[in-house]
Amino acid sequence: MRSSARISIHQMTALMEKMPSYGDYRSDEQAAEAERTFRRALGVMLKECGDHLLNVADQRSQALNAEEEGKVDALIDRIGMIFRRLDREGDVCLVGNCDNTIHELEEIDLRLILVIEKATEMVRNLESGTQTNHWFQTEAERLSRDLSSFSEMTEERNYLLGLGWESEFSWPGRESL
């Protein structure tokens, strides 16, 4: 694997610097702003993944078959679902025991960063000399699973932060915290 296919240290550092420091929140406004900042940073990286997929699909449009084009569309749809979940606004109100919830949020945030790093690497591999049909047979399915996992973790964060819509109802498998 080429090093150019990896996420840059600058990108990773910038994302990690935007991770919320939940224990340091002193006001609702501070919590909401920290959330917006982190969510935007995740969204920027997801947008880059989506843009890269679309650019490669456009550049290789004649080489892609209908199934491969369908996979690109499905991946873009998954990214769109994540955007909707990242776009949740509202008052941050941690559910359950604050210490336990903060610990869970920190774990989820780290997993989100690892997934976005892996997703970025997979998307960039599509252009880095990997044969297109091989990428669509192996990497596209892995990327789809990773994006699905990312989406679920995003919704779990929403629940833990008390941020609306699906989160207004109990998170599956969580009767109480």
Residue ranges of model-derived segments:
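Leu/Val/Ala/Ile-rich N-terminal alpha-helices, chiefly Sec-type signal peptides and the beginnings
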Residues: M1-S61
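Preference for long, well-ordered alpha-helical segments
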Residues: T132-L177
